[in-house]
């Protein structure tokens, strides 16, 4: 499935124009006296749809009026991504919003949060609990470590998003600030806070992050990715 990457203005328009929904699943007993609208899916004694369409049906329940409501949002503008046809490994518990681009053989681990407009290149791994803000971009064959944050930018629309290059390793709990670009082949050490652009093939560390060395054979060996983890 191909998703066209959106500009900031397109994302803002998408959110602003979207019908805000409170999606619910309702399990009920008794009989519904009112007709079920087309916007509501009824499977046996379970209803799926927007709360504002389902609530009136429950008011008119006949006989047994018990019901249970399950919900996970309120007036949400952006649905979660339909992952069924994405050629990537996405583990349970990852939260990925609509209009996210995910390349072939990428890996999204449990607890990762990926906001609207983000782009993840082929073969890239987003580790547990990592956060990719709106419009953040990661190239191919990179690794975003557990708990790392790539800050998002949707407003102001003129601001530049985070851009991570190809073959980059961002260590656990590192933070890359809005607008920063990290060049191909570079390494961001665990816990670093990156406030300025990082050139290609260097290691940065510290708060704020500074270049501590150029990539050498020893660093490449320590940061090599495992292709077996990306097999589908």
Swiss-Prot record:
EC number: 2.3.1.89
A matching Pfam family: Hexapep_2
Record SUPFAM superfamilies: Trimeric LpxA-like enzymes
Keywords of this entry: Acyltransferase, Amino-acid biosynthesis, Diaminopimelate biosynthesis, Lysine biosynthesis, Repeat, Transferase
InterPro entries associated with the record: DapH, DapH_N, Hexapep, Hexapep_transf_CS, Trans_hexapeptide_repeat, Trimer_LpxA-like_sf
Oxidoreductase as UniProt keyword: no
BP-aspect Gene Ontology terms: diaminopimelate biosynthetic process; lysine biosynthetic process via diaminopimelate
Molecular function GO terms recorded: tetrahydrodipicolinate N-acetyltransferase activity
Family named by the database record: Belongs to the transferase hexapeptide repeat family. DapH subfamily.
Task performed by this protein: Catalyzes the transfer of an acetyl group from acetyl-CoA to tetrahydrodipicolinate.
Designated name of the protein: 2,3,4,5-tetrahydropyridine-2,6-dicarboxylate N-acetyltransferase
Source organism: Streptococcus uberis (strain ATCC BAA-854 / 0140J)
């Amino acid at each position: 499935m191909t998703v066209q990457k959106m500009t900031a203005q397109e994302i803002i328009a998408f959110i602003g124009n979207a019908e805000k929904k409170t999606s619910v699943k309702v399990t009920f007993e008794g009989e519904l006296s009112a007709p079920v609208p087309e916007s509501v899916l009824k499977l046996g004694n379970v209803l799926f749809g927007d709360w504002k369409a389902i609530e009136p049906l429950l008011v008119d329940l006949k006989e047994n009026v018990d019901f249970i409501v399950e919900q996970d949002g309120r007036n949400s503008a952006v649905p979660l991504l339909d992952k069924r046809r994405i050629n990537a490994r996405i583990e349970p518990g990852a939260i990925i919003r609509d209009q996210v681009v995910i390349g072939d053989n990428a890996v999204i681990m449990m607890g990762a949060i990926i906001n609207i407009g983000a782009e993840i290149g082929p073969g890239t791994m987003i580790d547990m609990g990592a956060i990719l803000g709106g419009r953040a971009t990661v190239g191919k064959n990179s690794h975003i470590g557990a708990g790392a944050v790539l800050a998002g930018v949707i407003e102001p629309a003129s601001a530049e998003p985070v851009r991570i290059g190809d073959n980059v390793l961002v260590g656990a709990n590192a933070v890359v600030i809005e607008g920063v670009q990290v060049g191909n082949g570079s390494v961001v050490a665990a816990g670093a806070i990156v406030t300025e652009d990082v050139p290609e093939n260097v290691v940065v560390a510290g708060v704020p992050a500074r270049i501590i060395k150029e990539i050498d054979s020893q660093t490449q060996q320590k940061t090599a990715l495992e292709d077996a983890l990306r097999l589908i």
